[in-house]
UniProtKB/Swiss-Prot annotation:
Domain of life: Bacteria
EC class: ligase
Originating species: Streptococcus pneumoniae serotype 4 (strain ATCC BAA-334 / TIGR4)
Swiss-Prot/TrEMBL catalytic activity: 5-phospho-beta-D-ribosylamine + glycine + ATP = N(1)-(5-phospho-beta-D-ribosyl)glycinamide + ADP + phosphate + H(+)
Enzyme Commission designation: 6.3.4.13
Protein name, entry field: Phosphoribosylamine--glycine ligase
Cofactor mode of binding and number, as noted: Binds 1 Mg(2+) or Mn(2+) ion per subunit.
Length: 420
């Protein structure tokens, strides 16, 4: 069968590469993809993620069995609804179900209504009201744009002034456009963060290994928030009992809740969680795979990925299997200046061979050669599996040291929280 993956980043590279490993898959198209993906035998399709009807025509013309939707903005724009209306299968939630991600206020309302543990909060479109709420509750406090903001719409404010400034930028300075026309302001939760993903169809769901992402740009969790600078899975120091509690108190009630609201969920659900003194609580939901977590979760899948998704789409029981070997860890290499202004056009090192996988995100061929150049904020990610976090770290950082990259940067402490 032939499959289509929509998106262009490292997440989509990992999804498409894993699908191509399946025995029944002859071809995986990626729209629009990036040039680095072609090194793994993936076929790029020059159609933007916003051109739903061109993508639908392509899928029909090329006899695509089903389409896997990667990015949040495509889901929020109703790409799955459009595919379904055209009689095509797509793996991802409808626009209504994806509102769990594209409106933080909606997600909060669902959590409160169905008793899911999360931070106390207020939602505001008026700056003076937001300011009064911040001044009443004090800092630290968290200010979030209600809508999608490329993972950069969250400010963890250490002071009241910082929080007021963040609210001002979103509500009055239009920093995130319509996405910041409302803000959710919530209590700062103390604890360790982790990610929990599940494949979902309605009330049936299949939990993946836990993961831990590193959002801040620089070592020691310093600097601005990014889309994510590295991750590892599973989280070795997180007891299974915590995962079981999260499933019972968070995943189940939310999925049952959206069914009751007439928005049944199909696709990947991501729960960004924090383990507090009162147990796991929700920081946010995403309506799709995380980036960079996908790149360290999918290499742990030992079953046939394409068959697993086909079964879930067909409401059959999938046979999903994961390795229990050690840990999978990955480090993102980004353009200097990311997540703010950054340069493009830096020549990239050769693709890794053997146990270290390269997933490309912002990469394109030079105009007159096959040299890969940087073409985005996050450029590529190196991933490996080893018996321990320490061994995986050593393997990745040795490879990065040998690559001697200039004009790019990476964090040198990915996974260190897991080394006691």
């Amino acid at each position: 069968m032939k499959l289509l993956v929509v998106g262009s980043g490292g997440r989509e590279h990992a999804i498409a590469k894993k699908l191509l490993e399946s025995k029944d898959v002859e071809k995986v198209f990626v729209a629009p993809g990036n040039d680095g993906m072609t090194l793994d035998g993936l076929e790029l399709v020059n159609i933007s993620i916003s051109e739903h009807y061109k993508l639908i025509d392509f899928a029909k013309t090329n006899d695509v069995a089903w389409t896997f939707i990667g990015p949040d903005d495509a889901l929020a724009a109703g790409i799955v609804d459009d595919f379904n209306q055209a009689g095509l299968k797509a793996f991802g939630p409808t626009r209504a179900a994806a509102e769990l991600e594209w409106s933080k206020d909606f997600a909060k309302e669902i959590m409160v209504k169905y008793g899911v543990p999360t931070a106390t909060y207020g939602t505001f479109s008026d700056f003076e009201e937001a300011k009064a709420y911040i001044e009443k509750h004090g800092a630290p406090i968290v200010v979030k744009a209600d809508g999608l903001a490329l993972g950069k719409g969250v400010v963890v404010a250490e002071t009241v002034e910082q929080a007021v400034e963040a609210a001002h930028e979103m509500l009055l300075d239009n920093k995130f456009g319509d996405s910041g026309a409302r803000v959710v302001i919530e209590e700062f939760l103390e604890g360790e963060e982790f990610s929990l993903f599940a494949f979902v169809n309605g009330d049936k769901f299949y939990i993946m290994p836990t993961a831990q992402d590193h959002k801040r740009a620089y070592d020691g969790d310093k600097g601005p928030n990014t889309g994510g600078m590295g991750a590892y899975a599973p989280v070795p120091h997180l007891p299974q009992s915590v995962v079981d509690t999260a499933v019972d108190t968070i995943v189940k009630p939310v999925l049952e809740g959206v069914i009751k609201e007439g928005r049944p969920y199909l696709g990947v659900l991501y729960a960004g969680l924090i383990l507090t003194a009162d147990g796991p609580k929700v920081i946010e939901f995403n309506a799709r795979f995380g980036d960079p977590e996908t790149q360290i979760i999918l290499p742990r899948l030992t079953s046939d990925f394409a068959q697993n998704i086909t079964d879930i789409l067909d409401s059959k029981e999938p046979n999903i299997m994961w390795t229990d070997k050690g840990v999978t860890l990955g480090v993102v290499v980004a353009s200097k200046g990311y997540p703010l202004d950054y340069e493009r056009g830096v020549e990239l090192p050769a693709k890794t061979e053997g146990d270290v996988i390269t997933y490309y995100a912002g990469a394109k061929f030079a105009e007159n050669s096959r040299a890969l150049l940087s073409n985005g904020g996050r450029v590529y990610m190196l991933v490996t599996t080893a018996d321990t976090v320490k061994e995986a770290q050593a393997s990745i950082y040795q490879e990065l040291y040998q690559q001697k990259i200039e004009g790019l940067f990476y964090r040198t402490d990915i996974g260190s929280k897991a080394i006691k």
